[in-house]
C-alpha cells in the first residue's frame, strides 16, 4: 500500500442546488469561505489528508451539482463512493423535503453498504431557520444515520461532519471480514496506483 496514507476514502456531497455543498467542501479542504459561490457544473473535487486513531486517511471529496440537468452525470459518481453526505439548508424547507429523494438516489446508484450522513447547513442563519434541529434529527433517526447541523460560514461542525464520516467508514472497513478476492480493485490517481476496496460487482 502507498506509505503516504493508510486509507483512501471517496466521499460524495449531494443535495439541492444552493444548500452550501461547495462552501462546506471549501471550508473543510481549504479553511476558506466565499459569500457568493458559482453553482457547481457537473462535479468538482478536493483532497484532504487527516489523522484519526493513529491512521492516516486521505479523503477524496466530490462535490456534485444539485440541478436536475446534471443528475445523469453525477449519478455515475455514486458507485465508487465509500460515504455520502446529504446536505440540506435549514432556511429552505424544500431542500429538507427533498432529502428522501436524494436518499432514493443513493439506494439506486450507490453500493449497498455505503455510509451516509445527514447535514443541515447554514445553522448560523438562526432568524431565517424554517427546519428545526429536532426535525432533522428525527429524519436521520428514522433512516438510521448520523446527523449534524453545520455552518460553512462560521465553520461550525464542518470538521466534525467530515471526521464523523471518515470514522464511520473506517469502522465499517475494520469490521468487514477479509474477502478471498485475489486482488483489490485499483484506481489510477495522479499516476499512483491506489488500492480500493470493492464491495460489489456488476
Curated annotation (Swiss-Prot):
Functional description taken from the UniProt entry: Possesses GTPase activity.
Record-listed GTP binding positions: 15-23, 33-40, 63-67, 121-124, 151-153
Amino acid composition bias (Polar residues), ranges on this chain: 174-185
Coiled-coil stretches: none
Positions of region (Disordered): 174-202
Organism: Oryza sativa subsp. japonica (Rice)
Family annotation (InterPro entries): P-loop_NTPase, Rab, Small_GTP-bd, Small_GTPase
UniProt protein name: Ras-related protein RIC1
Compartment(s) where it occurs, according to its Swiss-Prot or TrEMBL record: Cell membrane
Family: Belongs to the small GTPase superfamily. Rab family.
A Gene Ontology cellular-component term: plasma membrane
Chief subcellular location: membrane
Lipidation (S-geranylgeranyl cysteine): 200-201
Short sequence motif named Effector region, residue ranges: 37-45
Amino acid at each position: 500500500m502507498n506509505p503516504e496514507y493508510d486509507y483512501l476514502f471517496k466521499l460524495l456531497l449531494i443535495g439541492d442546488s444552493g444548500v452550501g455543498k461547495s462552501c462546506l467542501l471549501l471550508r473543510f479542504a481549504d479553511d476558506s469561505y466565499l459569500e457568493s459561490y458559482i453553482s457547481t457544473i457537473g462535479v468538482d473535487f478536493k483532497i484532504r489528508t487527516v489523522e484519526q486513531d493513529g491512521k492516516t486517511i486521505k479523503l477524496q471529496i466530490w462535490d456534485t451539482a444539485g440541478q436536475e440537468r446534471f443528475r445523469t452525470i453525477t449519478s455515475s459518481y455514486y458507485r465508487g463512493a465509500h460515504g455520502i453526505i446529504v446536505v440540506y439548508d435549514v432556511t429552505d424547507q424544500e431542500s429538507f423535503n427533498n432529502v428522501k429523494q436524494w436518499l432514493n438516489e443513493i439506494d439506486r446508484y450507490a453500493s449497498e453498504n455505503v455510509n451516509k450522513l445527514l447535514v443541515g447547513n447554514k445553522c448560523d442563519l438562526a432568524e431565517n431557520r424554517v427546519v428545526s434541529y429536532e426535525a432533522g434529527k428525527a429524519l436521520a433517526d428514522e433512516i438510521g444515520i448520523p446527523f449534524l447541523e453545520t455552518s460553512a460560514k462560521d465553520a461550525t461542525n464542518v470538521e466534525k461532519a467530515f471526521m464523523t464520516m471518515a470514522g464511520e467508514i473506517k469502522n465499517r472497513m475494520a469490521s468487514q471480514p477479509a474477502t478471498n478476492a485475489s486482488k483489490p480493485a485499483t484506481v489510477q490517481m495522479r499516476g499512483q496506483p491506489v488500492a480500493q476496496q470493492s464491495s460489489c460487482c456488476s
